[in-house]
Amino acid sequence: MSFLDHIKQRRTIYAVGKNVALTPEQIESVIKEAVNHSPSAFNSQTSRIVTLFGESHLQFWNIVRETLRKIVPEAAFEGTNAKINSFAAGYGTVLFYEDQDVVKALQEQFALYADNFPVWSEHSSAIAQFAVWTASVSYTHL
């Protein structure tokens, strides 16, 4: 399958489940490879990931649920809770974030471009997320 075919096959999976053909270690390997080989401005590689499986995955979604329970109106919480339950039903969670220490260091090192690094960092994150999403097409229910 070509890269463009992978892009065309990429879809949001709403019915998340635990039927996954890969081990957590294999999933982490695919994700790390995709992120590590994603281009970034000045080869800054600011994108970071956290993968959660098993109990830590469930704990994360319980934290999200209880946090949102405090701010979402009670009348709307049922729908919010259903969405959280659908995410918690998955095999794991991948969290993306940007290493702000690296961004700040680049801003100091290349002062002329300082205002651009936060934006470029977000671009890097988008590219990394796209790479992971597209790589997942090669695997069943990643």
Predicted regions, residues:
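Short, flexible, mixed-charge acidic loops at enzyme active sites
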Residues: 64, 106-111
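Short glycine/proline- and charge-enriched loop/turn segments
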Residues: 11, 109-116
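Short glycine-enriched loops at secondary-structure junctions
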Residues: 98-102
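Short pre-catalytic strand/loop immediately N-terminal to key active-site residues, enriched for Gly-Thr
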Residues: 115-124
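N-terminal amphipathic, basic helical "cap/leader" segment at the start of enzyme domains
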Residues: 1-93
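Conserved coil-to-alpha-helix start sites within the AMP-binding
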Residues: 123-131
